Amino acid sequence: MDSLQIPWLTTAIAFPLLAALVIPLIPDKEGKTIRWYTLGVALTDFALLVTAFWQNYDLGRTEFQLTENFAWIPQLGLNWSLGVDGLSMPLIILATLITTLATLAAWNVTKKPKLFAGLILVMLSAQIGVFAVQDLLLFFIMWELELVPVYLLISIWGGKKRLYAATKFILYTALGSVFILASTLALAFYGGDVTFDMQALGLKDYPLALELLAYAGFLIGFGVKLPIFPLHTWLPDAHSEASAPVSMILAGVLLKMGGYGLIRLNMEMLPDAHIRFAPLLIVLGIVNIVYGALTAFGQTNLKRRLASSSISHMGFVLVGIASFTDLGMNGAVLQMLSHGFIAAALFFLSGVTYERTHTLMMDEMSGIARLMPKTFAMFTAAAMASLALPGMSGFVSELTVFLGLSNSDAYSYGFKAIAIFLTAVGVILTPIYLLSMLREVFYGKGSQAPLSLAAGEDAKPREIFVAVCLLAPIIAIGLYPKLATTTYDLKTVEVASKVRAALPLYAEQLPQNGDRQAQMGLSSQMPALIAPRF
């Protein structure tokens, strides 16, 4: 780092963490001061990062920028190494913006407000750290740092089954972390030079068996967070029991950490393994899309239906990163950003509805549109974005993934046709379960409208402001996608090109005599789906 350069990223990570440590010293029993303090810290951190990127980030470069590198624990080979590129920068902005809005959404939290605020700020530091660190061991530390806050936020401020949901979350994520750590150590200790530097690890020449095992470990660990079927079962429970602000961060940011890890580590560091796992990722992505959509139909709890919808939509990320195309990669990153805003908006508005009706069961909410017209309008807009209505960000991201897969030369025509057809089935199911959700919650039989909902008790200005801040980028990106894609276009092209460069080496290993049985014999690599066309 240049001696005159401001350590922007270190400041952005340390500031919320240090601010959280100050909270116990603030004299405030009712939490009124804590609200403004937490909002101020989150907003300051967001403004700091926007300023740093605006003044110092060059969109025309793909290498890491705003870099910082200090020896932290030399005995362990651990460096405080930070930097951002086109992949991490927009996700950091997403994380800080959603966390800032979540502090506004949590304005009415009165139970242990100091602890709640402190945990939110610790999570913010961890999220920025995950996206900014360039040391693999430091990445793992940041990854783990957000687990305990999420567990406490669900177990203390959640619903009736909060302990079950929180325990399930921590067990799943802890198990995934074991695989991430195992893969991290395997790569770092291979060869004579022990290093955790991500760029150095990406340059090592690993045996194929080690690369495949490390890839599988990362896939399981990140697959829990994404989540990928069948590692997804913690998500509906966590969402249904978590408070709305926590669900906003969980769906808007934490799920994206899984997608980021798959791109940053699995694709960039292990391209040879990625080309062998890519067909499996396509299959898992399609399963996510269709399974999530089908299970959403059976959910009578509003937040569980939205959780199933998240599982479905995150499947597009898997399909995009396994397409081997620039378009597919572009769509995968855009889907992460788009779903971050859309999911945060939907879970926030479900919380607004819950505060009035005191229920999440859709049949018990039936008929509240006439009492909450503003909430209904905002909820409808977010749902339209989720079902990929043209003019909204969800449409652009999903269409881009479709085009990326259809234009891929890495898969046989038959495989692509089946994959696109099944993905389209999931897309068709989405408006059915979302529109039925709107009908059941806001219309239905008016006589069943909750008695606890006072006439005219609609969304307040603070709540409208939060919803508008989430809906604005959804519409802006939908109308002019380059607002988002400009930040990462060059990076996605670089990553996709790096993976494609490894593909011919793999193609040369395939049987040249057209013996399909011989190809299918390498079942762990699924080569029959790969065509040597690059």
UniProtKB/Swiss-Prot annotation:
GO CC, any one term: plasma membrane-derived thylakoid membrane
GO molecular function: NADH dehydrogenase (ubiquinone) activity; ubiquinone binding
InterPro entries: NADH4_N, NADH_Q_OxRdtase_chain4, NADH_Q_OxRdtase_chainM/4, NADH_UbQ_OxRdtase, ND/Mrp_TM
Main location as per UniProt: membrane
Membrane topology: Multi-pass membrane protein
EC numbers on record: 7.1.1.-
Enzyme's top EC category: translocase
Gene Ontology BP, a term: electron transport coupled proton transport
Record field: transmembrane: 6-26, 34-54, 87-107, 113-133, 136-156, 169-189, 209-229, 243-263, 277-297, 311-331, 332-352, 376-396, 418-438, 464-484
Catalysis: reaction(s): a plastoquinone + NADH + (n+1) H(+)(in) = a plastoquinol + NAD(+) + n H(+)(out); a plastoquinone + NADPH + (n+1) H(+)(in) = a plastoquinol + NADP(+) + n H(+)(out)
Protein family per UniProt: Belongs to the complex I subunit 4 family.
Function: NDH-1 shuttles electrons from NAD(P)H, via FMN and iron-sulfur (Fe-S) centers, to quinones in the respiratory chain. The immediate electron acceptor for the enzyme in this species is believed to be plastoquinone. Couples the redox reaction to proton translocation (for every two electrons transferred, four hydrogen ions are translocated across the cytoplasmic membrane), and thus conserves the redox energy in a proton gradient.
Name under which the protein is recorded: NAD(P)H-quinone oxidoreductase chain 4 1
Organism field: Picosynechococcus sp. (strain ATCC 27264 / PCC 7002 / PR-6) (Agmenellum quadruplicatum)
Organism lineage: Bacteria, Bacillati, Cyanobacteriota, Cyanophyceae, Oscillatoriophycideae
